[in-house]
Every structure is written in structure tokens, then in C-alpha cells.
């Protein structure tokens, strides 16, 4: 699958759907906290870069962050988080639930509905 810029915007916004899709700053913190929960499973030499990207998990700034960092860095960060999230026997139940729900929403986003719209954008 080839990722497009809008895919990265969508991925960065998925956390908002997971916790209620809100402009509430506490929700933004909750999204970042969930990403930080993966820190123990991210290779040590990659933690700083991943956490810097995690800090950009904000509904208002995600599109700007994509432009600022570029698609390659986002692709890398998502790949690292995915590998961390899918490490065998490593995730606790909260992390597993978060990852499962994010992936469910992500794949819903990939499939247009009968009107040609993507679920995660509705």
C-alpha cells in the first residue's frame, strides 16, 4: 500500500477518535500518554525521534506537522510504533486495546463507503 500525505494526517488523528475526537487539551495529553506507553518497546536509539513525533499528535497541528517533518519521517515513526505495538507478548491490555482500535479505525479509513467517503474523515 502506498501512503499519501492525507494518510499521515489521518493516522495522526486516529488517537482523537480513540478517545472521543475532541479539542479538549486533556484529550491531546491522553493521546500522547498512550503513545508514550509504547516507549519501553521502541529501540533506544529511536526513542527521541518517535517521542518528538508523538508530541505532534494534536488534531489542530497534524497537517502542519506532516508538512514540517515530511512523509518519510512519518512513515518511519508509524513503522516503529507498529513494530513496538506488535512485539510478541510485550503489550499490556491497555496498549493492545489501543492498537486494535486504532488499526480498526485505520482500515475503516482505507475503505470508502458507498458515497466514496472515508469513515475516519466523516
Across the structure, where does each feature detected by a protein language model lie?
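Small-residue-enriched hydrophobic alpha-helices in membranes
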Residues: 1-122
Amino acid at each position: 500500500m502506498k501512503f499519501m500525505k492525507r494518510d499521515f494526517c489521518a493516522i495522526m488523528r486516529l488517537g482523537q477518535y480513540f478517545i472521543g475526537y475532541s479539542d479538549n487539551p486533556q484529550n491531546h495529553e491522553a493521546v500522547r500518554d498512550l503513545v508514550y506507553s509504547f516507549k519501553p518497546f521502541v529501540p533506544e536509539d529511536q526513542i527521541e525521534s518517535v517521542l518528538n513525533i508523538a508530541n505532534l499528535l494534536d488534531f489542530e497541528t497534524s497537517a502542519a506537522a506532516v508538512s514540517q517533518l515530511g512523509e518519510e519521517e512519518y512513515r518511519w515513526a508509524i513503522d516503529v510504533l507498529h513494530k513496538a505495538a506488535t512485539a510478541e507478548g510485550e503489550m499490556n491490555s491497555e496498549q493492545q486495546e489501543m492498537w486494535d482500535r486504532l488499526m480498526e479505525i485505520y482500515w475503516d479509513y482505507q475503505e470508502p463507503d458507498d458515497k466514496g467517503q472515508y469513515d475516519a474523515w466523516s
